[in-house]
Swiss-Prot record:
GO BP terms in the entry: translation
Family: Belongs to the bacterial ribosomal protein bL32 family.
Keyword Ribosomal protein: yes
InterPro entries to which the protein is assigned, alphabetical: Ribosomal_bL32 (IPR002677), Ribosomal_bL32_bact (IPR044957), Ribosomal_zn-bd (IPR011332)
Biased composition (Basic and acidic residues): 11-22
The species this protein was found in: Pseudomonas putida (strain W619)
Domain of life (superkingdom): Bacteria
Protein name: Large ribosomal subunit protein bL32
Pfam family, one: Ribosomal_L32p
Gene coding for it: rpmF
Alphabetical keyword list: Ribonucleoprotein, Ribosomal protein
Amino acid sequence: MAVQQNKKSRSARDMRRSHDALSENALSVEKTTGEVHLRHHVSPEGVYRGRKVIDKGADE
């Protein structure tokens, strides 16, 4: 079992944890439909960068 040889200071512990923060997802609004979607992803209506790339009717 691993056991530390010397105690880590509060500063060293906090510096290690400085990159652990979570951030919110970057959301975009589609210009043509107004749909909210993740950046660089197709919107729920099948539109990407103003163009219809997925026909929702064909999938069903």
